[in-house]
Amino acid sequence: DGIRDVAVTGVQTCALPIWYVATHGAPPHPGALQTDHDVVGYFSSLTGRVMPLLFERDGERIDVDVRSRHGVFVNESTAHLTALVSGLGVGQTFGFMARPHLASGALVRVLPEWSRPLHPLHIVFHPSRNQSARLRAFVDWVVELFAPYDCSARR
């Protein structure tokens, strides 16, 4: 079929504590990110569209449109994380990427009472009846690599 579920992963809203949070304070509500804070965000390399920040709490969902905000907008996850760790603003990044930086104190969670919907990860490959052993081994390795970060019911 050419697609395999890898994991369902969480997304963390983070900022650099020693510069960004110390200077600007933590946002009190997701809506404050639209008016009072610098944002590190993503844009689509295909469409140029800036992705909103998404928040959920107790059945309430807020989509924060950050297109008009000051900040940095990138289309690559390592650049995004680097911008966060450099103190350029508040952003949402995959939990598995943020984990070591949160553990070391380089990043802190902001708006911890709000979560972002879980994000599915998939691996896509050319479908073939005669799938090579190398491809199967690679796909299995990727699934195994992400298993510790899988928040789905499969765990």
Q: Regions from the language model: what does each represent?
A:
Residues 95-100, 104, 114-155:
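C-terminal effector-binding regulatory domain of bacterial HTH transcription factors
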